Structures are given as structure tokens and as C-alpha cells.
Amino acid sequence: MSNALPKGVFDIFPYVTSPKNLWRNSSLWKRVEHAAHRICNLYGFDEIRTPVFEKTETFLRVGEHSDIVKKEVYTFLDKKGRSLTLRPEGTAAVVRALLDHSADMRKDNKFYYILPMFRYERQQSGRYRQHHQFGLEAIGVRHPLRDAEVLSLLWDFYAAVGLQHMQIHVNFLGGQKTRARYDEALREFFRKDLDRLSPLSQERYHANLLRILDSKEPEDQEFIEKAPSILDYIDDRDLSYFDAVLAQLKALGIPFAINPRLVRGLDYYTDLVFEAVTVVGERSYALGGGGRYDELVAQSGGPSMPAFGFGVGLERVIQTLLEQGNSLSTSTRRLRLIPMDEQADAFCFSWANRLRNLGIATEVDWSHKKPKLSLKDAADQQVSFVCLLGEQELATKQFIVKDMSLHQSFSGAQQDVEQRLVYEVQNA
């Protein structure tokens, strides 16, 4: 019987050290997730957690013709024949949760989440059937400064984790009237060459016209480049809104580029849409994206409420950090006590608890190996500090702590050592 995982999923494991799989090390994930929590807290966003599965109808609202709904959802019937779906994206679930808690709804609702998503993706680099998304939803306010604020938050997150060569690509899809005018122009443009488009784009021509612009098929690129720009169809009010957002990005020093071909893969987006991309030479790929979805709450049975949000795939963020040579440590600042005999065992057990109460992450090596082997294990496992305790240390009450990264030591009485460790941990 094979214990191998199904395709498209993976373990986030604490002891991974091989370069190929280092991105799966749980210490890296904790650091990136901590940055997301910290930045969202600074901007006044609160965490939300929705169920792993919901009624299928919740996710149909993202668009019956979107790739997610048509091809990628994990849907099943429960024992009573009810259709349920594993969460493929966060926005629809958050909107559903907000409406379910309507008594607690505010005029300005600010949520973020770090949750697994499930999609039946084609097997390729950077895509997984269970992936993890850092997402944010701001529901209730329509203002160009809100859009700029959310983009600023996202930019601060990328800076906090150490991503480089980032740029925001933006477009403006407009509301229903703008989209109707643009759809008419786009349909007329593609009609004369419809049989030369890829099969997928021919299908989208009849079901979801705008998504042709998102095609990666080689035979479509010539036509996409020549297609009308939606920016020629937005009215003065939309243009003023778009310009106001761009002015704030410029003031914040956030590099951006206008991409009139940019659309999103879900049908609920309106007005401003964006992708955050990393650009290295001629190669670029998205590390997140989102935009405004002012009609989704009403389409979900709620009041008319404007909204703006984004989603960031954490797998790709962590992989990119490592590709860019970011020196992410897979270890935490931790002390390992190594008792050399049974008498030291009891002291180490007691002292470890005292150190933890002081805020010092402390573990005890109970193996009673030879000191040389215990020190080698500590070095291999990237332990920050090591303290060997035997008969002499207990008799003199003088302890030596080795700093494994600096290859230096400091020593002193118990209280002095504790104060030094607290300082080292707080100033790491």
C-alpha cells in the first residue's frame, strides 16, 4: 500500500533543508504569514475564517463561465444529496459570511484571511490542487483612496517579506454601461477572425468575451495585441476615479504600469483591476491580484455594497523569495539545553520552564549522547544557542552558552545568562 500523497498537494514540514523543497519548510511559512498578520493589523483589518466547504451555489456566483466553476472546483454530494464544494477562492465565501452575520455588519467591513483553497489545476510548476492564499476584502466603501490604501497594504506586505523587482499592473474595466459598449466593440473586432482564434477563445467569444484578452494561447496573441482598448470606452467619471488611484500610487512611490489588456479570471470584477508582478529581465509573473467587485454583494442577495480586495498565492511568494536569493532562515531563535547526567536532567527540566516563562524558546536534548554528537545535531538543525550542563556547571552555578551562528560563547551565573538570552531574543 502506497502512502504517497495525491497529485497537487504537499506537506509543510519543519525539517525540510534540501534546496529543491526548502519552500515547504514550515519556518518560512510562519515568517511570511506573520508578516501578513502584522501588516493587516497595522491597517485595521481583522481576520476571518470561513469553512473549508460550503454549498456549491455560494461559488457559482463567481461566474458560471469562469474556469474555476467550469473546470476546477471540487464538488461532491453529501449523504443527503446536497451539493457541496471545497472552497476554490475566498471572496464569495467572505461575502456569504458577511450576509449571514448581517446583524453585525458595519458600513466599512475590513477582513483578511490566510486559508487553503482547492482547485483541480493542471499539473505545472507553481500550481497546486490545494494552495494557500493570503486574501483581503474591504466591503462597504467606494473611494479611490480606499483602492490605493489596499494596494499600499499589499505593497507593504511584499516589502516586509523581502520580495524584489515588484510592479503593479492596472486596468479599469468600468461599470455595466462601459462594459456593454466595450463588449460590443470587442465582439465586432473578433468576429471577422473568429475561426483563427484558439478553441478556448472561440468558446469564450460566446460565453465570456472579455476573457479572450486573458488567453495565453500563441495563436491568440496577434489579435489580442490589436484589440480595442477598454480605456477608450470609459467615461469621464471613471477616468477621473482611475487617475485618482494612479496619482496616489505615484505619491506612495509604488511602481505601476497600465495594461489595457488586463482582465481577471473571475466574473465579478468591475472598475479597477490589478496584478502584482515580479519583473526580472523579460520574464514576469503574477504574485497576486484583485480589484473592485461592487456588484457581488447585491448579486449574492445582500444590499448594494461596493468592495475591493485581492488574493496572493503564498506558494509562489515563498518560491520567488528563494529564487531571488533571499536569505530566509529556516530556524527560530531557540536555546537547547543539553544535560550530561541524570542530576542535570532534573535541573534542565525546571530551568527550561523558567526560561520559557521569560519568553525564551527552549528545548532539552534528553538523548544523553556524547557532547560532540549533541553539538553536531544542534548545528545541523540550526539551533541558535546551546548550553551543556553537567556536574561542574551545577556545582559552580556558572553556565556557558554557545552562539551557534556566531561561533562565540558567553558565560555567567544563571540570572546573568537569562538576561543575556532575553536580550539576544528580543534583538534578533
UniProtKB/Swiss-Prot annotation:
SUPFAM superfamilies given in the database record: Class II aaRS ABD-related (SSF52954), Class II aaRS and biotin synthetases (SSF55681)
A molecular-function term among this protein's GO annotations: histidine-tRNA ligase activity
GO biological process, one term: histidyl-tRNA aminoacylation
InterPro entries xref list: aa-tRNA-synth_II, aa-tRNA-synth_II/BPL/LPL, Anticodon-bd, Anticodon-bd_dom_sf, His-tRNA-ligase, HisRS-like_core, HisRS/HisZ
One Pfam family hit: HGTP_anticodon
Keyword Ligase: yes
Gene3D superfamilies, sorted: Anticodon-binding domain, Bira Bifunctional Protein, Domain 2
Catalysed reaction equations from the record: tRNA(His) + L-histidine + ATP = L-histidyl-tRNA(His) + AMP + diphosphate + H(+)
EC number(s) from the headed UniProt entry: 6.1.1.21
Compartment(s) of residence: Cytoplasm
Family matches, as PANTHER family: HISTIDINE--TRNA LIGASE, MITOCHONDRIAL-RELATED (PTHR43707:SF1), HISTIDYL-TRNA SYNTHETASE (PTHR43707)
Stored HAMAP family: His_tRNA_synth (MF_00127)
Assembly, per entry: Homodimer.
Name by which UniProt lists this protein: Histidine--tRNA ligase
